[in-house]
């Protein structure tokens, strides 16, 4: 009983986190948002089940369907499962399709496995479910999953799939099998290639008329033999003898969740003959088939792979001004997990790029990880009914503004502090954007180098800066005084690469001020345009004032 309660709590906790916080909508808006998404999903359902085509990626469909369910629960507007296919199948299944309950994580799976024995793991093949009925050794009927009780008659289609045995013998001569019709692949690596919309492609091939040749691109993975042999090994052997060899090849005995996790990770990275979206763990002991009902299977569960892309709700649009004055746009998101990373923000790019994407708070966007684990936007998959986009700040900033603090300069000023503290410039370890904001808010810096005047006492009494960290920070600030002249010039934002600056052999502020445009132009990677920028930079009043201030502080290279 305690174990079952733990499982229930684990599932509920996972569901709570997955459903997230309910939107702060009025009843009228909730009705509108739910109705719009419901209509769209119904249209996708009709396209998928009636015409065999898909206008949306499988993963996006699944996640938006889950989002609709969440909204319905939030506002007491639950209806039938939107992912349930239309009830237009007329052929009764000899044995009902139960479906499979999904485990939230390894811990939930471990709790489920603890009360069971003789367990086996199989890949969760991504395709469409089917019933195969053999009578007197011949394929008698093939039925689509439908609603689990009734489905479409797919017999003629399945007879054209060469990979499906049309005749069997022995124990299978009069049998009912359940499995997955899938798209045959050569060396499909799920980790690298993703789902390729396999489910929709299979459904399309099965729904279309007159496509007998293309049906040979399909095969079947049998995952259940209701009322079959009691021993799983006997089941697998008989299936393989009959021609269903994949089931034996990809079914393994497991004792615990660690072993399942190992196999799951192996298949995630391995070359497989089909697309998968996780694994299924099943007990060899099953009830008699007459007890099978949709949604009632307690002898098997699924542990799906984490999607390579997640649908995330945009909570806010924020604007940031970089050290060069360029305005960038960032979307704050309701947290989603990607590859064990919690994603709460994604960079959209420039204001123009944001306007092209047409993203507003409340929209649903598809997010994945680019190189080095950086979040990126793949698509806007759903736009809200009520869309209010913020007004971007005026583009009044450039590479020569905001060396000195002011109300309008707040963001670019902070960006300059973050830049000068980075490893490639002054190397101030232990302080980032949050730390700079705390220091500036408390001590009201005059300019980007005002931190050099902070005392140990001031740092220790700064809200947001831990006292244990303040001494280390003061030490870092003092060490910065010993940084080479070129590092300080970089901190001042000189429009040159480090390589060009080092090649200039400039060792003092006075020497740099007297260098001509022709001198800068001859440096590697520095053309006439960049040389003019350097001249404009060194003649800027704010830059000259900073140079004089650093001279008064006896910073290396700035001494009189």
UniProtKB/Swiss-Prot annotation:
Reaction(s) catalysed by this chain's protein: NAD(+) + (deoxyribonucleotide)n-3'-hydroxyl + 5'-phospho-(deoxyribonucleotide)m = (deoxyribonucleotide)n+m + AMP + beta-nicotinamide D-nucleotide
Protein's UniProt name: DNA ligase B
InterPro entries named in the record: DNA_ligase_AS, DNA_ligase_B, DNA_ligase_CS, DNAligase_adenylation, DNAligase_N, NA-bd_OB-fold, NAD_dep_DNA_ligaseB, NAD_DNA_ligase_OB
A single MF term (Gene Ontology): DNA ligase (NAD+) activity
Gene3D superfamilies for this protein: DNA ligase/mRNA capping enzyme (3.30.470.30), Helix hairpin bin (1.10.287.610), Nucleic acid-binding proteins (2.40.50.140)
UniProt similarity note: Belongs to the NAD-dependent DNA ligase family. LigB subfamily.
Superkingdom of this protein's organism: Bacteria
GO BP annotations listed: DNA repair; DNA replication
Keyword set, alphabetical order: DNA damage, DNA repair, DNA replication, Ligase, NAD
Function according to Swiss-Prot or TrEMBL: Catalyzes the formation of phosphodiester linkages between 5'-phosphoryl and 3'-hydroxyl groups in double-stranded DNA using NAD as a coenzyme and as the energy source for the reaction.
Active site: 124
Pfam families found in the cross-reference section: DNA_ligase_aden (PF01653), DNA_ligase_OB (PF03120)
UniProt organism field: Escherichia coli O6:H1 (strain CFT073 / ATCC 700928 / UPEC)
E.C. code: 6.5.1.2
Lineage of the species this protein comes from: Bacteria, Pseudomonadati, Pseudomonadota, Gammaproteobacteria, Enterobacterales
